[in-house]
Swiss-Prot record:
InterPro entries: PurM-like_C_dom, PurM-like_C_sf, PurM-like_N, PurM-like_N_sf, PurM_cligase
SUPFAM superfamilies the record matches: PurM C-terminal domain-like, PurM N-terminal domain-like
Cellular localization per UniProt: Cytoplasm
Primary location group: cytoplasm
Pathway: Purine metabolism; IMP biosynthesis via de novo pathway; 5-amino-1-(5-phospho-D-ribosyl)imidazole from N(2)-formyl-N(1)-(5-phospho-D-ribosyl)glycinamide: step 2/2
Alphabetical UniProt keywords: ATP-binding, Cytoplasm, Ligase, Nucleotide-binding, Purine biosynthesis
GO MF annotations, alphabetized: ATP binding; phosphoribosylamine-glycine ligase activity; phosphoribosylformylglycinamidine cyclo-ligase activity
Record protein name field: Phosphoribosylformylglycinamidine cyclo-ligase
Taxonomic classification: Bacteria, Bacillati, Cyanobacteriota, Cyanophyceae, Synechococcales
Length: 344
């Protein structure tokens, strides 16, 4: 008996590494030393930082992977993996520096895994960070054949004098919402139950979704907000006081995270139109309003906190960067998130 007959194909693993090499090395910033194949990735700190702070974050894609694997759509979840990590670490004003991935699978499918890594590389390129390394673990008997799980790790850097920690936020500051691309990567355990209970065909056009299929709408990759945040930070006379990445828990659980004690986020639910995808899910699944607000982003993927004097310039940067943004509320004295509709 050999290793291959036990379910681990080392040669397929080598071919996989060669297949992804070009995509991975294309993401490398000037600070990266060496290429693939070392025991560890090497990366210098960017020059010109007075007191550099490293910011680290880790995350996964959750059960969105189940839907992606069922549909054979693997590229987008690679982007999702980077977005879930990078969108978190940039909330303190940090610039993503490098990314590491971990892929665990029952049996290595070089084609599917290459799609995933190409998606990860695309996400890294969009975020301006290097895909510095990764691990692909073939674990027969632990994971079913054809199934895989993903974990990502992002390290960013910020100069301590430019750290955004929310401590300068004050009553009267405005909340600038940045649109999401859809469900992003949270709430898919509920999504999958809704699809299963209603026997929704995944690849069939849905009128309620503007002609897109459920697979197309639900597997739309998470938006990467790093290019926008970088553009905002480079804008003269624009002051960013806080940021929130709207993930699991929705607006009610993520908006308070950057706020100092004694301040609340007063939102205006009438300031935006909830995307059709969320109406469709709510109707199909008879989802209570509270669960909707505490599970999904409802069309807002990222929120900026800034003084009113910076709003117009910030909105111009948002739109010039290809994103959609609007004022969705303000900071008031209080606690948590205020202004939620009845039942939320």
């Amino acid at each position: 008996m050999d290793y291959k007959s036990a379910g681990v194909d080392v040669e397929a693993g080598r071919h996989f590494v060669e297949r992804i090499r070009t995509s991975v090395e294309a993401t490398h910033r000037p600070e990266v030393l060496g290429g693939l194949g070392g025991f560890g990735g090497l990366c210098r700190l960017p020059a010109g930082l007075e007191k550099p702070l490293l910011v680290a974050g880790t995350d996964g894609v959750g059960t969105k992977l189940e839907l992606a694997q069922e549909c054979g759509r693997h590229h987008g979840v690679g982007i999702d993996l980077v977005a879930m990590c990078a969108n978190d670490v940039i909330t303190c004003g940090a610039e993503p520096l490098f990314f590491l991935d971990y892929i665990a699978t029952g049996k290595l499918s070089p084609a599917a895994m290459a799609e995933v890594v190409e998606g990860i590389a695309s996400g890294c390129s969009q975020s301006g960070c290097s895909l510095l390394g990764g691990e692909t673990a073939e674990m027969p008997g632990f994971y079913p054949a054809g199934r895989y799980d993903l974990a990502g790790f992002c390290v960013a850097v910020v100069d301590e004098p430019r750290l955004i920690d929310g401590q300068t936020i004050q009553a009267g500051d405005q909340l600038l919402a940045i649109a999401s691309s859809g469900v992003h990567s949270n709430g898919f355990s509920l999504v999958r139950r809704i699809l299963e209970a209603n026997q929704v065909p995944l690849e069939t056009s849905q009128a309620a979704l503007g002609g897109r299929s459920a697979a197309e709408a639900l597997l739309e990759p998470t938006l990467l907000y790093a290019p926008l945040v970088k553009a905002l930070l480079q804008s003269p006379e624009l002051e960013l006081r806080g940021m929130a990445h709207i993930t699991g828990g929705g607006l009610p659980e993520n908006l308070p995270r950057p706020l100092p004690q004694g301040l609340a986020a007063q939102i205006d639910p009438g300031s935006w139109q909830r995307p059709a995808l969320f109406h469709w899910l709510q109707e199909l699944g008879s989802v209570p309003e509270r669960d909707l607000w505490h599970t999904f982003n409802l069309g807002i993927g990222y929120v900026l906190v800034l003084p009113e004097s910076s709003c117009q310039q910030a909105l111009e940067v948002v739109h010039n960067s290809g994103f959609t943004g609007w004022i969705c509320g303000e900071i008031v004295v209080g606690q948590g998130v205020l202004g939620l509709p009845a039942g939320a």
